[in-house]
Amino acid sequence: MALLSPPSPPPPLPPLRRRPASPTLLAVATRPSSLLSLPHCHCGLPLPSTANARAYSRSSRRRRRVAASLGQDEPGVSDTAVAPEGEGDSEPPASSDGAAGDIAASAEQPEASPEDLEDIRQVKRVLELLQKNRDMTFGEVKLTIMIEDPRDIERKRLLGIEDPDEITRDDLADALVEVNEGRIPENRVALQLLAKEMTEWPDLEMEAPKKKSKPGKSVYAKATDTGIDPETAAKRLNIDWDSAADLDDEEEEDDETEVPSAVGYSALYLLTAFPVIIGISVVLILFYNSLQ
């Protein structure tokens, strides 16, 4: 029976080696925080335990030694004072009331002069007249204003005139829209040109001819007898009478004037008798010459 030898003791552990931290990590780790007024004052910060406090002190001493070996100043002991909270490069945000006031001041339009108000009244008066006399809507007036004279376009092209500050037809249309909406146009030059052009509208005061209340007979229906009674045809088709075949006794009396039949056919007889008269005259002249 073999004797059991006592267990051999475990081999001794090698001593721990401490490696200095790299300068990049050291700079990141030792950057001063703006949240603390003093770099090493931790009196007001509660530590979770005594072990953590010891570990923190050891790490602080280690950072000091590494910084001294690299020839750098200790970042934590710098004399630079940290600005208190709320101060620094960043300016305090502007209040919403101040910003709204600036926007309102910039958006405020200059006061309108009496000439501008007179131009606006002229434009509105012309719009009312066009709607009353010409039955034109605002869209039709706007499209008419936007049409540019082709003669002006050709003249500018031949002369090479290109003025970027010139008032265009679109500017006039925008001014017309603003006047129609009850606002004062910002472009006062466009307002003046618009008022001048609107007042020079041709035949502005002349009223449009009134349309007939009932459609009358067309020229073809008056001159041609189709042999179809329009009233009977409309009853069979169950539709309204066609304007080309509508019979209106009152309109017929107004349009047609009574002419005697003798006067009407006399012109036809006279034109027909001219060749006969000429032929008879030639025969008589020849017969008279033959007798001599």
Swiss-Prot record:
It is a single-pass membrane protein. Residues 49-58, 94-112 have a biased composition (Low complexity). The chain crosses the membrane at residues 267-287. The keyword Chloroplast applies. Its main location: plastid. Residues 1-67 form a transit peptide. It is found in: Plastid, Chloroplast thylakoid membrane. One of its GO terms (cellular component) is chloroplast thylakoid membrane. GO terms for biological process: chloroplast organization; heat acclimation; hyperosmotic salinity response; photosystem I assembly; response to photooxidative stress; response to water deprivation. Keywords: Chloroplast, Membrane, Plastid, Stress response, Thylakoid, Transit peptide, Transmembrane, Transmembrane helix. The keyword Membrane applies. Belongs to the Y3IP1/CEST family. Involved in light-induced chloroplast development and growth. Involved in the plant response to abiotic and photooxidative stresses. May be involved in the suppression of photooxidative damage. This is Protein CHLOROPLAST ENHANCING STRESS TOLERANCE, chloroplastic. It comes from Oryza sativa subsp. japonica (Rice).
